[in-house]
Amino acid sequence: MVRLLTMLLISMVVSGYYFPFSFSVLPQLNTKMALAMLGIALVAYQGFQKHRITFSRDLLGAIVFAFIFSFICFVAADYNHTDDYSYVTYFVSFFTWLGGAYVVCYVIRAFHGKATLNLLIAYSAFVCVSQCILAILIDRFSAFRALVDTYISQGQEFFQEVGRLYGIGAALDPAGVRFSIVLLLIVYLLCEDEGVKQVRWKTFACLFAFFVIAVIGNMISRTTSVGLFLGIVYLICSTGIFRLVIKGRYIRLYSILGGMLIVFTM
């Protein structure tokens, strides 16, 4: 039970990072910013303990790129005499996302002993499915919607005005883009990870998450259809079904997929 509650807490951290939102009492501070500040504090604390802060070569390259991009945008804005400096502060947004990501990886590693792509995909898929379910609950039950709208500030007045589904921090195109990314990652697991392909319940869980996100995610944001299309293309190209030949290691995947399609279409 404790393990399950801990995993649920980690999922809430992932959701707060991937689908940031604000509380009504602090509308200017969203969960991503809060996680970023916590991430900076963690980096400083660990650096103090180890007497040094290290960066990987890839991360250092990304940081340099962020500063170069911001500098180019500053020069462009100054040269064109424009007052729009939105992209000049891109490096601030970069470090905000980076700090939040550090916290996500930290809590996953603290509980599981490691932070791998598979674990990140699993938590992200669970969060996306949860957001889809929350969106349906908010839409169908006015009492639940009132509860969410009372304590969560996410511009829900506009969502209600245009008649769109929304979760907690998940709405419109930003949600669609993130749903699309997770759909592609789920297909990656189904096609490339032997540990998923050879275990029936893992294959079923991934396919179930894919279906839920594809269907309800499209109701939240039609941008999700981009991830659905690319995911199907990835699946077809990786498994070789377009050659009308199914490789042995994909038989389990297609048998479960076929069964789920029959159930969902009945």
How does the language model describe each region?
Residues 1-9, 51-66, 116-123, 200-205:
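Membrane-interfacial loop-to-transmembrane alpha-helix junctions, especially the N-terminal start
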Residues 118-149, 169-220, 224-241:
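Alpha-helical transmembrane segments of multi-pass inner-membrane proteins
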Residues 40-53, 103-114, 187-196, 233-245:
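Structural signal for the C-terminal ends of transmembrane alpha-helices
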Residues 28-46, 91-100, 176-184, 226-233:
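Membrane-embedded alpha-helical segments of multi-pass membrane proteins
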Residues 139, 236-266:
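A membrane-periplasm/extracellular boundary helix in multi-pass inner-membrane enzymes
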Residues 1-49, 71-77:
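N-terminal signal-anchor transmembrane segment
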Residues 61-68, 82-106, 119-123, 128:
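Aromatic-anchored transmembrane helix interface
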Residues 15-24, 154-170:
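Juxtamembrane membrane-water interface segments that cap and precede transmembrane helices
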